[in-house]
Amino acid sequence: MKTLIFFWNLWLWALLVCFWCITLVCVTTNSIDTMASLLVMCILFVSAINKYTQAISSNNPKWPSSWHLGIIACIVLKLWNLSTTNSVTYACLITTAILSLVTAFLTLIKHCTACKLQLEHGILFTSTFAVLMTNMLVHMSNTWQSSWIFFPISFTLSLPFLYAFATVKTGNIKLVSSVSFICAGLVMGYPVSCCKTHTCTATAAGLSLSSIYLGFTGIISTLHKSWAPPKRGILTFLLLQGGVLTTQTLTTELLAITSTTGNIKGHEILLLVCLIFLWCLYVWQSFNKASLVTGMLHLIAAWSHTGGCVQLVMLLPSGLTRGILTMIICISTLFSTLQGLLVFYLYKEKKVVAVNSYRQRRRRIYTRDQNLHHNDNHLGNNVISPPPLPPFFRQPVRLPSHVTDRGRGSQLLNEVELQEVNRDPPNVFGYASILVSGAEESREPSPQPDQSGMSILRVDGGSAFRIDTAQAATQPTDDLYEEVLFPRN
């Protein structure tokens, strides 16, 4: 605890000095990008300070999440390229970045200890951190022109994986974080095209493959523990969307490597916007249930991204590259279409369950000759799923037997009984279950026999539906159990 508090205090002071150095860089370079980075760092700094002070003053501290420090470290490394001419700013930025990563690592260890981290989660967490540290060292030891953008992207995509397996979250979040780490591994493989030595190429390729392997390990571990009938639908839905995001990330990266045309700025913006939108929907659905709206939005955004990729693929000179990218695009389109069909199927099943909410077990009515333990196989005495309603019965009400007695003639209802009648919501189908005494059953067949086996029972000038079964003839007349429907007038 003392070590963690020491590093937090050291990180806060280093970041304050870093703000001063970055402000000098903003003044000297007049860069909008640097000013925006400084603004983001200020927001994250204030949020981290707020949680840090609450943790210090509380008896049961809840330490800030390490993603604050990770993003700040990425921004600091991004600004490191702008300060190569100033040794003071260079040293300040590097020190702040290292302190941010170390403090983030210690904070994650604190979270792991508090949550009683399991062994496999600890192995995944340690391996992930080793991959990220090696990736950072590879980027710092090389002088690539555009390498700074790929390390923040890969680090940001790796943060959900670290957070999910360090705090032992639910299966949906673990699955999404594993897919995110696979995409981070794909982004880590981009520097392979920029490496000038075999050591750099081998290191970057090893980092990429290690991240992809850890991501698939997380998916298998999550499915092994959470693959239960109640969650199979949403997990399959998230797996299909994860396949869409993985293939589209790979397609975008390959297009960035192989594309040689300069006038594709509009297509790049379209691809970037679609990917960001897809990731936002994907993360949002990991915390919520799948819905028809999000599934359709995901389908539209995925097809828009596919259309932009197809136009860029047609501009490539190599036939082999076009063939590989076309195959990946077809796989992405298949995944996106399947997730759209699946979310429509899940919504349809949910709607059927919602409409059929009237299918519930009703209380059984016993006669004087029966007791509570009497059990006969008469279908009318144990009705669970009633027959389909006629189309003109849309808003029936639930009438208890003490309110209405059709066997002795209907009476006018007073105000209290009307309130009891209209107590249920109008969209719920209800039934009035009564036992008619002195009823005469019609032995004549129905003029229009129904497949459900229903016959007409005449009661004092009225009619009631009864389920006709093979055992009905053996039951006494006073044991008949009718289902009488009363439509709302």
UniProtKB/Swiss-Prot annotation:
Which cellular component terms (GO) are annotated to the entry?
host cell Golgi apparatus; host cell plasma membrane; membrane
Q: Which residues form a coiled coil?
A: none
Chain segments annotated as transmembrane = 29-49, 63-83, 89-109, 121-141, 148-168, 175-195, 200-220, 237-257, 264-284, 296-316, 324-344
| Swiss-Prot/TrEMBL keywords | Host cell membrane, Host Golgi apparatus, Host membrane, Host-virus interaction, Membrane, Signal, Transmembrane, Transmembrane helix
What kind of membrane protein is this, topologically?
A: Multi-pass membrane protein
Signal as a keyword? Answer: yes
Checking Pfam families in the record gives: Herpes_LAMP2 (PF06126)
Question: Which compartments does it reside in?
Answer: Host cell membrane; Host Golgi apparatus, Host trans-Golgi network
Give the protein's function: Plays a crucial role for reactivation of the virus from latency, early viral gene expression and virus production. Modulates host signaling pathways including activation of MAP kinases c-JUN-N-terminal kinase (JNK), ERK2, and NF-kappa-B resulting in the activation of AP-1 and NFAT-dependent gene expression in B-lymphocytes. When expressed in epithelial cells, induces the expression of several inflammatory and angiogenic genes. Also interferes with B-lymphocytes signaling through interaction with host LYN kinase.
Q: What is this protein called?
A: Protein K15
